[in-house]
Amino acid sequence: VRLVGSEMCIRDSFLTTCYAENMETQQVLLRFDNPLWNLLELAGYGLLFACCLSLSGKAGAKFRRGLLVFTLGLILLLGGMLIVFGRTVPAADALSVYNAAAEWILGNKDIIHPTVSYLSYYPQQIGLMAFLELLLRLWNLTGLSAPAWHFVKLVYVCLLCVAVLFQYRSLRYLWPDDWEPVSCCYLILVCCNLPMILYSSFVYGEIPSFAMLSVGLFLLLRLLADCIPAHSVETTFPDDTRVVGTSHALSAVTVFTALGSILFLTLSVMLRKNSLILIIAVLLVLFFEALRPGRSGRACIGLMAMAVCLTITSVGVLPLVQKCYEKKAGNTLSSGVTAMSYFAMGMQESSRGCGWYNGFNIDTYDAAGMNSDAANAISRAAINERIAYFREHPGYAVNFYLHKHLSQWADGTYASRQATLATYGGRSDFLKEVYEGSLASAYIEWGNAWQNVLYLGMLLFCIATVRKRRPGNGSANAAANDDFRFRNLCLYTYTGLIAVLGGFLFHTIWEANSRYIFVYSLLLMPYCAAGIHDGLVRLAAWRSNRTLTRHSNS
């Protein structure tokens, strides 16, 4: 499944590009790419990675640490420049949530209302509102008159650095034998990820939620590595403490690591409800890791208990936050726009693209008098109508879902320009050109090239993990072919890939938007880095083996 999915992604991204030119209509366009040009771009990236690995091999840890500092500094620099010169402001849903937080601070209790409140349509946004309320209250303490959203964007830039740092630290647990060269490839990927920089100015849930995810996943990986029985652990880290149950202190560390992982993963759901997809992946991993042969009864019970706690907290965090606000306001919120209406909308045409937002969900909720049962009935009727039409026109159905898929997974910009387009003036001429001028096509091409690298690296990683062992021949590439360590990876290594697979299936039937795929692209970066490193190692081994064969024949 991993191999087929990654092959499909690289094929679609390599042959096509989806993008938007008109920032008013934001219609998603599809074009066919020049394969030769894409190969040239991939070769350029390959040369960059090869040079990076060569320098890492010569300079060792100093180069890696320097590259980490450079990467974090680059994020801070570009993110800060985007705040100063981009002047992006919240818009659409982001503005509604931001204004709700600001109005609540001013004492407007109508923010919590069963009919007239934005939150009565989208109560899942209340967690993000609580987070923004905290940031706005902190900003108000400064007494400065500048708009608070600039401060929020600065916090987001810092959170992006946190996300990168903890994802970088996770590599040590994902690939303990090869994490140093893989980390160099990862940092190069981060440095070239321009849509990620643009999203640091998007005052919404993506960046803070991903930061919480990165911390939570790091703690999860650390926990699962520590729970491995001592007799089955081989580690190259002198300070690694993977032996379980040897002391009360270690047991306390394990418990606090588990609680920390639960806390941050729960916060990610509070900030962005779609993070539940990754939570499901984590729960699957915890369940199967608990049943893994060799686990002690204590470890099995502990992992099962963690899964139960994570289920309760991730499902209950948003209702809990909502209850707190309702108690303070002395009022209640409605149940909100139904999920069924999103599924129905995902089967319909839109001016932006197949399955994209067309207002059906909120129009249906209004037409039903904000009654969830009535809205679901209307949505089910719309779904049945589309299913009947698809059956009568199978060619249209295939074309519809093909374009829906490409509009999300073949957009290398991840709708970053559309998401951060709004401004009240003051945007620099350079960034105006990036958004709507002559540099827009260059930005689209940059994003497309980066996405091709991402999918190719993921494909190489998946090929490496399914490759059958072959008997060693003592050649220079024997280590690459015979003792390929990726084949012995634990299940928890694939948590991110499982989440991406779940997201792929979910967004095939949900409302379409390439912005929703942005977080999945960040989750794929470690796997891409590992695949690129393995591909370059195999290429170097093949060249070395070919040279030896030539010399032996001569």
Give the location of each predicted region:
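Short, small-residue-biased leader/transition segments that mark boundaries at the very start
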Residues: 1-10
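Extracytosolic helix-loop segments that constitute the early lumenal/periplasmic catalytic or substrate-binding loops
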Residues: 95-120, 127, 351-359
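Multi-pass, polyprenyl lipid-linked donor-dependent membrane glycosyltransferases
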Residues: 152-159, 185-220, 268-278, 516-521
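Transmembrane-helix motifs of polytopic, lipid-linked glycan transferases
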Residues: 154-176, 215, 460
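Transmembrane-helix signature of polytopic, membrane-embedded enzymes
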Residues: 167-192, 494
